[in-house]
């Protein structure tokens, strides 16, 4: 596939995962309303904050990629690293647990969807980084 078209596919994946994170944040708001203890409320507040920030960050990165296309590798690197960090946080949450939240015991379909999308985002972003470097080398140099 042509790298220019892959940038659009990557942006579509990024916008999709941002919507997934907003849905998960909305679910956490519902859990916060039904929380009984202060620890449960604190955990829900942390989840809402994390998922809202991640969703907004993905929206910003998707917009940056659409605006700059293949002229800079920076948003591709940020998206790949950020997605890897989110997968790492999820792995910690299901194995050893997060201090306030504890170990994640429920099998959440949104978490599975998010991790599949993030794997695709990492693969596409890493694949597109060399294309950005080649395109920027072909650009004319400005003599000042």
Regions found by a protein language model. Name each.
Residues 1-144:
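Membrane-interface extramembranous regions
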């Amino acid at each position: 596939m042509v790298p220019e078209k892959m940038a659009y596919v990557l942006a579509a994946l990024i916008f999709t995962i941002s919507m997934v994170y907003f849905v998960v944040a909305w679910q956490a708001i519902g859990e916060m309303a039904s929380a009984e203890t202060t620890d449960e409320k604190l955990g829900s507040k942390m989840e809402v904050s994390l998922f809202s920030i991640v969703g907004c960050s993905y929206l910003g990165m998707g917009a940056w990629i659409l605006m700059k296309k293949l002229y800079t590798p920076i948003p591709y690197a940020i998206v790949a690293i950020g997605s890897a960090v989110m997968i790492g946080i999820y792995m910690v949450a299901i194995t050893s647990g997060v201090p306030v939240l504890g170990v994640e015991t429920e099998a959440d379909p949104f978490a599975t969807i998010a991790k599949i999308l993030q794997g695709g985002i990492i693969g596409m972003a890493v694949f597109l980084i060399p294309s950005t470097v080649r395109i920027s080398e072909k650009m004319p140099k400005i003599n000042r």
